[in-house]
C-alpha cells in the first residue's frame, strides 16, 4: 500500500553530502532576503558566490524557495555559486548523483562516476570542479529556482519520490537545528561582542579553524561574527 511504499522509500534514502540544502527554510544567519555580491562572498550559509560581475549575481531568499540569478544579460558573462568541503566527499570512480527539486516541485537528476558534469538546462550547469566542491554555473540572464538540492553517492536519486497522483514529495525534511549546527562550524553570529570567543575550540559548536572576527549590520542592529568559511 501507499504507507508501505513511503516507508521503504524512506529506508533507502541516501545521505545528502551537502549542508544547507533545504531551500524551503534555509539557514540564513546573515539575515537578508537578497544578496548581490561579487566574487568570494557568502549569502545564505555554506554557499559561496564566485563571480567577477559585481552586483549582477543575486541570491534571493523567497517564500518556499531560493533563487540564483545572473542579472547580466551580456553573452559570455556567467556566475557561479559553490559549496566547498574540508575533505573529499566523492571518491574517485564511485557513482554520485545530484538532484534538484525546483520551485514548482519538479525533480530532475544526473549520475556520473567521474565527477558531476550536468547540463541542467539551457545555460545552467551543475558540476564538481574537484571532489571537495559542488558548483552551479548560470550563463547570462539565467535564473534557477530551487526548493532542495542533493548530492549523494550511488546511481539513483533519493531526494524525492512520486505519490500515487504523480506529485514529487521530498523523502526527508532536515532538522533545522542540526543544519544550523553544521553551518556554525563555518560561521557564527553573536548579538553581544563580549560573549564571542576568539579560540575556535571555545565556540559551540567548535569551529573549523581559528575564525576571522568581524561585524555585520542587519536592519539597524550590529552583530558580531566569526568566520571559518572555506
Region annotations inferred by a language model:
Residues 90-95, 103-107, 142:
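Extended, low-complexity, turn-rich repeat/linker tracts enriched in Gly/Pro/Ser/Thr and Asp/Glu
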Residues 42, 47-48, 59, 66, ...:
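Solenoid scaffold repeats with emphasis on beta-solenoid/beta-helix
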Residues 1-31, 135-193, 226:
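Extracellular polysaccharide-targeting segments
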Residues 86-98, 131:
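Extended extracellular/luminal ectodomain segments enriched in beta-structured repeat modules
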Residues 73-78, 103-124, 130-132, 188-230:
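Phosphate/adenylate-binding glycine loop and adjacent helical scaffold
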Residues 25-52, 214:
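Short, tryptophan-glycine- and acidic/Ser/Thr-enriched carbohydrate-recognition patches
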